[in-house]
């Protein structure tokens, strides 16, 4: 089935003049393909997709797109990718949507070749996440991001490389800016919106608005037609991706308002020092959060790049470089019920993953919404959630081969690609540094309702209950009150 939904009204945003190379053809690659076809002019005879598995090869065969059934590895990436990315004239585009592909090495290669590049995570080569010889600090996303930042500082400028631009990390950084502008307006603050490149101005506005922290607050209510059997891991997006990040240490951007740190909390000795990590797996760490549909909920403090990049971006420093303000920032993720059950089984078996991994596609799911937004809290209006409430039904109508979760990612990849084509020599950028308005303009047709909600909920609501708790009643929005212990 080719893209039956391609109608004349979808805008074509630009032309990719060189070859297109997509690394990975799992749930996100499959969903991104029709969006690339719909919104860009490109030479299909110079598009190549690489994946070690050929599960969905027929989608490529019917389009006449070349498929290479091979994993991109540390040993073969230069030899494998260089001819594909330099095939014919024009500027190529490398779209990395795979696990176990060393992002920083691929960025370096693309910049050397003058090729545009985008990914959804700073991904290491195979073996990093489960390296028993490595200490936990070196298995963090903080360490991965620092490697990317070093590359950026060592070699500024050059062909645009968009780092970590999916739904989250990625889109949520654009939501944070829109939410901040909405909040500052509703608070009646006198302000003019900072320019895209004015990081300091954005940080000062966040401080002025009195925001103590930000949850990337998500609830996935997509349900399957049939119940999950035992000994399989079901998820609405990459199972390998979820397991690897779920078994990394929990990580959070660490705000200046925090008065208490868990005993197993650890600071970093080098770099921005914008984040801390806990000596426990993120997918087995719960926090109290809030989304519009369920209201109060438990979320998982799974590590994500945006928890670090957003906290870093909105840091206010003195002239001497001393940190004067920083918001706490972390993921608070309630995945689909089947994924929660899968995690429960996995951690029950001491973290041993189930032998069968399966991504639930749009045909196996019956209904539900992926409600993904940012919760700005601790200000004079208490808390404000702003985000996408995309339903499975709407995702099915908008584009083929994806559920609601996938579409929030693929549409962010699309927006990042558009921005890169329009700004081809920006060097390495994170989503926080891009033009959030332009990116959301491109992405919003795929996001369902994008709305803001104020709430009077705090993590101290209905607490303590029947049992004594260690709470900080002077400030409801302390991490002490948010972390489930």
Swiss-Prot record:
What InterPro entries does this protein's entry cite? Homospermid_syn-like_C, Sacchrp_dh-like_C, Sacchrp_dh_NADP-bd
Task: State its Enzyme Commission number(s).
Answer: 2.5.1.44
Q: Which cysteines are joined by disulfide bonds?
A: none
List keywords of the entry alphabetically: NAD, Transferase
Q: Which reaction does it catalyse?
A: 2 putrescine = sym-homospermidine + NH4(+); putrescine + spermidine = sym-homospermidine + propane-1,3-diamine
> Under the GO molecular function aspect, what terms does this record hold?
homospermidine synthase (spermidine-specific) activity; homospermidine synthase activity
Q: Which Pfam families match?
A: Sacchrp_dh_C (PF16653), Sacchrp_dh_NADP (PF03435)
Question: Which top-level enzyme class is recorded in the Swiss-Prot or TrEMBL entry?
Answer: transferase
The cofactor required is: NAD(+)
Q: What does this protein do?
A: Involved in the NAD(+)-dependent synthesis of the polyamine homospermidine from putrescine.
Give the UniProt family note: Belongs to the saccharopine dehydrogenase family.
Q: Indicate what this protein is called per its UniProt record.
A: Homospermidine synthase
Organism in which the protein naturally occurs: Mesorhizobium japonicum (strain LMG 29417 / CECT 9101 / MAFF 303099)
């Amino acid at each position: 089935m080719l893209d039956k939904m391609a109608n004349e009204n979808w805008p074509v945003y630009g032309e990719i003049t060189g070859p297109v190379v997509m690394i990975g053809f799992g749930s996100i690659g499959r969903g991104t393909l029709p969006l690339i076809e719909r919104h860009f002019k490109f030479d299909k005879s110079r598009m190549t997709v690489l994946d070690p598995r050929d599960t969905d090869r027929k989608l490529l065969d019917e389009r006449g797109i070349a498929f290479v059934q091979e994993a991109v590895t540390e040993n073969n990436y230069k030899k494998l990718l260089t001819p594909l990315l330099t095939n014919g004239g024009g500027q190529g585009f490398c779209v990395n949507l795979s696990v176990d592909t060393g992002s920083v090495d691929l960025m370096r290669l693309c910049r050397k070749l003058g090729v545009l590049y985008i990914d959804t995570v700073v991904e290491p080569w195979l073996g990093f996440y489960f390296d028993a010889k490595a200490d936990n600090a070196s298995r963090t996303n903080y360490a991965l991001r620092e490697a990317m930042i070093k590359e950026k500082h060592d070699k500024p400028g050059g062909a645009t490389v968009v780092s970590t631009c999916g739904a989250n990390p990625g889109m949520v950084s654009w939501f944070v800016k829109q939410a901040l502008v909405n909040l500052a307006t509703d608070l009646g603050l006198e302000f003019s919106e900072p320019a895209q490149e004015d990081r300091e101005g954005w940080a000062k506005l966040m401080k002025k608005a009195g925001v103590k922290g930000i949850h990337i607050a998500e609830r996935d209510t997509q349900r399957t037609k049939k119940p999950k059997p035992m000994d399989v891991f079901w998820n609405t997006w990459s199972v390998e991706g979820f397991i690897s990040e779920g078994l990394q240490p929990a990580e959070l951007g660490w705000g200046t308002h925090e008065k208490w740190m868990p005993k197993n909390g650890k600071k970093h000795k080098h770099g921005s020092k914008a984040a801390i990590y806990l000596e426990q797996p993120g997918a087995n760490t719960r926090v109290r959060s809030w989304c519009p549909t369920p209201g109060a909920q438990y979320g998982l403090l799974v590590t994500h790049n945006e928890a670090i990049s957003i906290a870093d971006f909105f840091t206010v420093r003195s002239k001497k470089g001393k940190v004067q303000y920083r918001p706490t920032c972390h993921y608070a993720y309630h995945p689909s019920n089947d994924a929660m059950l899968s995690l429960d089984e996995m951690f029950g078996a001491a973290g041993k993953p189930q032998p069968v991994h399966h991504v639930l596609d749009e045909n196996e799911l019956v209904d539900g919404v992926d409600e993904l937004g940012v919760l700005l809290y601790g200000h004079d209006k208490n808390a404000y959630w702003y985000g996408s409430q995309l339903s499975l039904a709407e995702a099915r109508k908008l584009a083929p081969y994806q559920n609601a979760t996938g579409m929030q990612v693929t549409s962010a990849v699309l927006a990042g690609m558009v921005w890169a084509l329009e700004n081809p020599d920006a060097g390495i950028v994170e989503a926080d540094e891009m033009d959030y308005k332009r990116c959301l303009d491109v992405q919003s047709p795929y996001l369902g309702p994008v709305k803001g909600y104020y709430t009077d909920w705090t993590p101290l609501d209905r607490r303590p209950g029947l049992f004594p708790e260690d709470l900080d009643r002077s400030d409801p929005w302390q991490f002490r009150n948010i972390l489930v212990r």
